[in-house]
Amino acid sequence: MKLHRDYTLTEIAQLISGDAIGDAGISATGINEIHVVNEGDIAFVDHPKYYKPTLTSVASIIIIDQKTDCPKGKALIVHPEPFNAFNFLTQYFKKEIEQQLSPDPVIHS
């Protein structure tokens, strides 16, 4: 999902009460599951089996369940429940986008 504006690492970490690690200048422009992630996206990982593929993906901000070395050019947010944090953000951003839409759409002919 594309976001209606860029969100900073700090903003995202505060929204989910997580600990930010890495490049504080990184911003998110989208949020997606790892199999469809794009550069600028937020992704999550909550199982050691998937740490390497997620940390080496093009995702810019990764929500993870334990502290680890942050790859260059990325940021991590440590959270005890990455899946729940990711779902919260998805719903939060969806509401933000819906609020940007006009309540009275006009169809032009």
Task: Locate each region found by the language model.
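Terminal amphipathic alpha-helical/low-complexity segments used for targeting or macromolecular assembly
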Residues: 1-106
